[in-house]
Regions:
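Glycine-rich phosphate-binding loop signature in dinucleotide/nucleotide-binding domains
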Residues: 110-114
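Acceptor-binding helix/loop patch of EC 2.4 sugar-transfer enzymes
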Residues: 22, 82-92, 137-171, 215
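Membrane-proximal helix-turn-helix segments that form the acceptor-binding/catalytic region
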Residues: 128, 132-137, 163-183
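Structural motif
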Residues: 16, 115-116, 182
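An aromatic- and histidine-rich active-site surface loop
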Residues: 97-103, 116-152
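Carbohydrate-associated surface elements
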Residues: 55, 189, 208-211
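N-terminal subdomain of nucleotide-sugar transferases
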Residues: 9-76, 81
Length: 218
């Protein structure tokens, strides 16, 4: 069934997929490369694919020639500038997380143009923006879990498992996993952990290894 909306008497067909992620092409880290490769695979399969991401700074040698908007291999990339501090300390990472998430929230109206939004766990609060988009625009959400929060933060001794932040993150993430349309995990072990600790229907969870970018598992 085609998802359409009316605007001044003209029926507009929604685009297929929007990627929402902090890092993307031309940045050279895995959390930028993997979404780019997935976007290319979806585009090659015949889907329309756009990207809403952060403007590159830390993981690129020179960003002076990087445009805010460009089309690469048929993929429309929209880059948004946000406050970026050094990621070498906890404070800088927190500022970056909230700054980028706030910028995505300010651009949430763009989400109404798409049938599906693919969102990643970096930063960990970013998926909340897509949940709001789901409620507002009835789009489907595919949640790609690179990391599990608050567990990863606790294991890195960034927060205590008894802390207020940990309890809030646990509550948010349990609801998040239930609300999204699909969950993508990177391994069978991660999938099993999600099923045992997030209360998710097994039918919603797929395993896609980092290197399995050629096949479409969604």
């Amino acid at each position: 069934k085609r998802l359409c909306s009316k605007h001044r008497g003209v029926r507009k067909v929604k685009k297929d997929v929007l990627f929402m992620c902090q890092f993307f092409y031309p940045e050279y880290i895995s959390s930028a490369l993997l979404p780019f490769q997935t976007a290319e695979a979806l585009k090659d399969s015949g889907l329309s694919v756009d990207v809403l991401c952060g403007f590159p700074k830390e993981y690129i040698k020179d960003n002076s020639k990087v445009p805010l908007h460009e089309t690469v291999d048929g993929i429309n990339i929209y880059r948004k500038k946000y406050l970026q501090l050094s990621r070498s300390n906890f404070f800088g990472r927190i500022v970056n997380y909230f700054s980028f998430t706030f910028m995505m929230l300010m651009n949430i109206l763009k989400c109404k143009k798409y049938k599906v939004i693919i969102v990643y766990t970096n930063p960990p609060i970013l998926p909340l923006v897509t949940l709001l988009a789901r409620k507002l625009f009835k789009c489907k959400i595919i949640f790609v879990t690179y990391d599990l929060y608050p567990e990863i933060a606790v294991n890195m001794n960034a927060i205590s498992d008894k802390s207020f932040i940990s309890r809030v993150m646990s509550k948010i993430n349990k609801n998040l996993f239930r609300e999204v349309s699909r969950v993508v995990s990177l391994s069978e072990d991660m999938k099993n952990y999600i099923l045992n600790n997030r209360g998710v229907d097994a039918k919603k969870v797929s395993v896609i290894h980092n290197w399995a970018t050629e096949e479409l598992h969604f």
